Amino acid sequence: WEKNKKFETALEMGLLQDKVFITAAYFQNRSSNQLVGIPLPGTTGFTSMQANLNAVVQNTGLEFTVNTTNITNDSFNWKTSFNISVPKNKLVAFRGLQNSAYKEQFRIGEPLNIQLAYNFLGVDPETGIYQFEDVNGDGQITFPDDKQTVVDLSPEFFGGLQNQVAYKRWTLDFLFQFVK
């Protein structure tokens, strides 16, 4: 069975009779024994089988929210909500990683959504050919030996800005989302 340990703490604060309401939260989730699809060879007739992954993954993050009531009266209301989240995750442990099908996909201490890449050194000014680091020193650029630079593809942060404008019985909602 999957095991989860969760911790969350938050601070909420209302100002100006709750016309401005602010929330800040921190969370940490540690999961182990996750149920995942383990890749199978094509000769089996199946792409994967469900099994427990022998790994420990930690997700942490900060979340901030600001809700405001900008204008409110008998016939007109305008409310705004802004939120931003800064998530992080990493592989804490994975017993037997080097002998698993995931050895080229995950690294202990790194985020889960990584891509291994060759370390780009520049362009040879004489030939115009891209130059990459020969990590293992064998004179050839090969996979997987030289593809060791970790590139994190996870978003640094994401959030949104929502506004709700209401006039009598008409309401207009619009939302802008962002990701970096």
Language model segments and positions:
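Outer-membrane beta-barrel signature, preferentially recognizing the C-terminal barrel domain
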Residues: 1-21, 49-73, 111, 152-158
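Short beta-alpha connecting loops at secondary-structure transitions
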Residues: 44-52, 102-103
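Conserved small-residue
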Residues: 69-153
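Membrane-embedded beta-barrel scaffold of Gram-negative outer-membrane proteins
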Residues: 1-45, 78, 85, 89-92
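Flexible, solvent-exposed coil segments and beta strand-coil junctions
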Residues: 38-48, 61, 136-145
